[in-house]
Amino acid sequence: MFLLPKYNSFFIFLLLASVIPILAFSISKFLAPNNTQGPEKLTSYESGIEPMGDAWIQFQIRYYMFALVFVIFDVETVFLYPWAMSFNDLGLSAFIEALVFVFILIIGLVYAWRKGALEWS
């Protein structure tokens, strides 16, 4: 049995998802005015005033650690929300799987806590 006809709608979607952005960028390239880059275009924007100082600032690593921990637990929330919405229909096995998922994330949180990733000092 050849299953390719079952995937026709998927291939059409894939084709349209590829063609529409290329078409939009091409039309924009041909219709947009051709402006040259002046010195104003090359400066950074700071609330409508002339920029003062260097635009490249180094951030401390602790900001990245907080951001990483936040993203991990934000993704956890995204995964747990659909599960919570269909909790009654899924049964005991889905509940156990969700508990294992949360337990693994708690282990990660304890590890980050013990390593000092959550300390602000």
Curated annotation (Swiss-Prot):
Primary location class? plastid
Q: Where in the cell is it found?
A: Plastid, Chloroplast thylakoid membrane
**HAMAP family the UniProt entry points to:** NDH1_NuoA (MF_01394)
Bilayer-spanning residue ranges? 10-30, 65-85, 90-110
InterPro entries membership: NAD(P)H_OxRDtase_bac/plastid (IPR023043), NADH_UbQ/plastoQ_OxRdtase_su3 (IPR000440), NDAH_ubi_oxred_su3_sf (IPR038430)
Q: Which Pfam families match?
A: Oxidored_q4
- Keyword Acetylation attached: no
Gene source species: Physcomitrium patens (Spreading-leaved earth moss)
* Example of a GO biological process term: photosynthesis, light reaction
Q: What is this protein called?
A: NAD(P)H-quinone oxidoreductase subunit 3, chloroplastic
Report which superkingdom the organism of origin falls in. Eukaryota
What quaternary structure, including any partners, is listed in this protein's UniProt entry?
NDH is composed of at least 16 different subunits, 5 of which are encoded in the nucleus.
A GO MF label: NADH dehydrogenase (ubiquinone) activity
Would you identify the family this protein belongs to, as annotated?
A: Belongs to the complex I subunit 3 family.
As for membrane topology, the entry says: Multi-pass membrane protein
| Top-tier EC class | translocase
Keywords attached to this Swiss-Prot or TrEMBL record, sorted alphabetically, are: Chloroplast, Membrane, NAD, NADP, Plastid, Plastoquinone, Quinone, Thylakoid, Translocase, Transmembrane, Transmembrane helix, Transport
